[in-house]
Design a protein with these regions (language model features):
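Cysteine endopeptidase catalytic domains of the caspase/legumain-like
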Residues: 1-204
């Protein structure tokens, strides 16, 4: 398999270099991946690269977004709370439904890992994905929560790697550390949620 990574760091609206540091930390921890870092891309630029990666059956792909997130009124009626989650991009908002639909349409890659360290980053609802096989979703907080930052990194990204050892994520410890920031990380693997488990094995 060919290991490919796409990491998006949106530095505007006061986030600064912390989100770039988050992206680079993932790249540093995954040296076996050939990674691309996109700083403040347009929605089209980001999605074009993502589609090119997930459409190839030989690829193992990790897609990470480090950005602002927000909620807007749900127009399609598919959200229980009446709100859609969005990634704030340079040229506008990317709604969760559009991103999920795009992944469902083009995904042919062997394995896909989605990482989001953004506010309201329950943006990836595993129930909305058609194919759960070899799909891992790791997000920094639940839909109604915000993601906090330390000076140089996002709280979630830094604590994620502090709690990840030898292929195993200590979910209990990660939750404990982020509880102080009022963040509830969301972890789903192959269609099963591990939010309240002690630990989970993650394949990168």
């Amino acid at each position: 398999m060919v290991k490919k990574g796409l990491f998006v760091a949106n530095t505007f609206m006061g986030l600064g270099e912390a989100v770039v540091n988050d992206a680079r930390l993932f790249m540093e921890k995954l040296p076996e991946y050939s990674c691309q870092l996109m700083r403040n891309p347009t929605t089209k630029e980001m999605l074009t690269v993502l589609i090119s990666l997930i459409s190839k059956p030989e690829n193992d792909v990790i897609f990470g977004v480090f950005s602002h997130g927000q909620q807007v009124r749900d127009i399609s009626g598919d959200e229980a709370d009446g709100k859609d989650e969005c990634i704030v991009m340079k040229d506008g908002l990317l709604i969760d439904d559009k991103l999920t639909d795009l992944i469902n349409k083009y995904r042919k890659c062997n394995r896909l890992t989605l990482v989001a360290d953004i506010c309201h980053s329950g943006i990836y609802d595993f129930k909305d994905f058609i194919n759960h096989k070899n799909l891992t979703i790791v997000t920094s907080c639940a839909d109604g929560e915000t993601s906090k930052q330390f000076v140089k990194n996002g709280c979630f990204t830094l604590q994620f790697w502090n709690c990840f050892k030898n292929g195993t994520l200590n979910v209990q410890e990660l939750r404990r550390r982020l509880m102080l920031m009022h963040q509830t990380p969301q972890i789903c693997v192959d269609g099963k949620c591990y939010n309240k488990c002690a630990s989970v094995n993650l394949v990168f």
